[in-house]
Structures are given as structure tokens and as C-alpha cells.
């Protein structure tokens, strides 16, 4: 039982009853199983600190001992209370995170010799049995219940995306892949007209529809609005688009010439 005698020596000057000796042994067993003492009372205090020794004023109340512990990995916190009842003690331990409880009742006469509390070798008797009682009644149940609660806990949920991460008004930087129109290459020869119809895979050569702007002959500026009473809005005819003129090429957009006299023989059906 390494460490118990050293702990007893540090606490012996303040021991005055069998209950003190039993709580000292209980504290040693809890620390041996991977805990630090934090302080006394139900609530944390400004004087709390992690230590393997008993905290100050740990036995100021002989009727009710209240000690708080924290596991070395910080995962579990215990609240231990020992209540004096006639010639025995009722020990209750609460795991603060899961609210799991374990309790144990011990008879003082079975484990403590009250005749000389200053002598370590005479104070405790049946030490192995006492240690087994504490482990099976408190330490093991608390650990098993904590592990079970941890295994049954729901998986961690990630918070939803913030407004900064998802903005419906923000233009996405990822543009969908769209098919692009093949670049129009001017034929180098007027005889290239219709070449695309001979190639089933299409090599971007001219088809049977002749574009007057891309026929290979000297180009003549054509007004797309020819034959219309008003001009087309900008962008109505994309550059390089194939189209049929709306009217005779070269007419004025203001309309035909105002002829006041009918043409000769307009009323002769046999003419």
C-alpha cells in the first residue's frame, strides 16, 4: 500500500476519531485510482488546487465529510460525502458529469482501531478487505457507469454553416462547366463552302448556308435593319450570326420613295 503511510503521517496530527482515519484511507484509495483532491464542500472555492494530500479543513465537520476530486485527465469529477451513523459510516460518491451515484456502508470497528490513532501500524486492520470494499462499492461502479454513459451519448453534432459561409446573394466562384461554341474560322477560299456537309464529324468548315459576311469574298457592310421601319436594338443580331435580311439590302430605314403617280399599265391585267 505505497503512499498510505506517508499520507497518514501528514494527516495524523489532525486526527481525533475513527471517522478521520477511515476518511484518510478512503482518500488514499481514490487518489490511487487516478484522482486529485480539489477541496472541501459541495461547490468549488478560491482555495481549490489539485493535490494528492487531504485539503485543508478536511475534517472540520465530524458528522459530514465532503471532498471533491478530479481525474488526472480532467474527464471526471467526483463529490464524495461520508456521513457518521452510530458506529459506522455511509459513503456516497456522485460523478458530477453523468450524475451517477455509488454508495457504501462500512462498520468502523471492522477496520479501525481507535485506541491509538497516532500509530499507523495499529490504526488500520483488515486493510486489504477495506480496500476491496471501497473498490467494488465505489470506484468500479462509478467508472463502469461513466463508461456506459459515454458510450450511449449521442455523436457530436457540428453547428450549421453560418451566414458568412452560405450567402445566397454571393456570386459563387465555382462556375459550371458549359459547352462553348467553336470559334468561327473564316474560310481561306470560297470553295470551302459546303465542306462541313462532307465531314460527318464537323471540322468547323463552311456549310451550304452561305454567310454573306464570311463567304471569303470582299465584304460589303450590311445593315441588319434593312427593310424595317426602325433600327434593331444593339445586340439583336450577334456578331457573325447567319441571318436573312428583313428587306431589300440598301433601302432606307425611313421607307420607300414616295412615288405620287402609279406605274404605267398598273391596271392592265394582261400586261
UniProtKB/Swiss-Prot annotation:
Please give one Pfam family short name. PI31_Prot_C
Q: Where is the composition biased (Pro residues)?
A: 255-265
As for subcellular location, the record says: Cytoplasm; Endoplasmic reticulum
GO-annotated molecular function: endopeptidase inhibitor activity; proteasome binding; protein heterodimerization activity; protein homodimerization activity
Q: Which residues carry this modification: Asymmetric dimethylarginine?
A: 219
Region span, Disordered: 226-271
Example GO CC term: the record gives: endoplasmic reticulum
**Protein name in the entry:** Proteasome inhibitor PI31 subunit
- Species of origin reads Mus musculus (Mouse)
Amino acid at each position: 500500500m505505497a503512499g498510505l503511510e506517508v499520507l497518514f503521517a501528514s494527516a495524523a496530527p489532525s486526527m481525533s476519531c475513527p471517522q478521520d482515519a477511515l476518511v484518510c484511507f478512503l482518500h488514499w484509495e481514490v487518489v490511487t485510482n487516478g484522482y486529485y483532491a480539489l477541496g472541501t464542500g459541495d461547490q468549488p472555492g478560491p482555495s481549490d488546487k489539485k493535490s494528492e494530500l487531504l485539503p485543508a479543513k478536511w475534517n472540520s465537520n465530524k458528522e459530514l465529510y465532503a471532498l471533491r476530486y478530479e481525474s488526472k485527465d480532467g474527464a471526471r469529477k467526483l463529490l464524495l460525502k461520508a456521513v457518521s451513523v452510530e458506529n459506522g459510516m455511509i459513503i456516497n460518491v456522485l460523478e458530477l458529469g453523468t450524475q451517477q451515484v455509488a454508495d457504501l456502508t462500512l462498520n468502523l470497528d471492522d477496520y479501525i482501531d481507535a485506541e491509538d490513532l497516532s500509530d499507523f501500524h495499529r490504526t488500520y486492520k483488515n486493510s486489504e478487505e477495506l480496500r476491496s470494499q471501497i473498490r467494488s462499492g465505489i470506484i468500479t461502479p462509478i467508472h463502469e457507469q461513466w463508461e456506459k454513459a459515454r458510450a450511449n451519448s449521442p455523436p457530436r453534432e457540428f453547428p450549421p454553416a453560418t451566414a458568412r459561409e452560405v450567402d445566397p446573394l454571393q456570386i459563387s466562384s465555382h462556375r459550371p462547366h458549359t459547352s462553348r461554341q467553336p470559334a468561327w474560322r473564316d474560310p481561306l477560299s470560297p470553295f470551302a463552302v459546303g465542306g462541313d456537309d462532307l465531314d460527318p464529324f464537323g471540322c468547323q468548315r463552311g456549310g451550304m448556308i452561305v454567310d454573306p459576311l464570311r463567304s471569303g469574298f470582299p465584304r460589303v457592310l450590311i445593315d441588319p435593319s434593312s427593310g424595317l421601319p426602325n433600327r434593331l436594338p444593339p445586340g439583336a443580331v450577334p456578331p457573325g450570326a447567319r441571318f436573312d435580311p428583313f428587306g431589300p439590302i440598301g433601302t432606307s430605314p425611313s421607307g420607300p420613295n414616295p412615288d405620287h403617280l402609279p406605274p404605267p399599265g398598273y391596271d392592265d391585267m394582261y400586261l
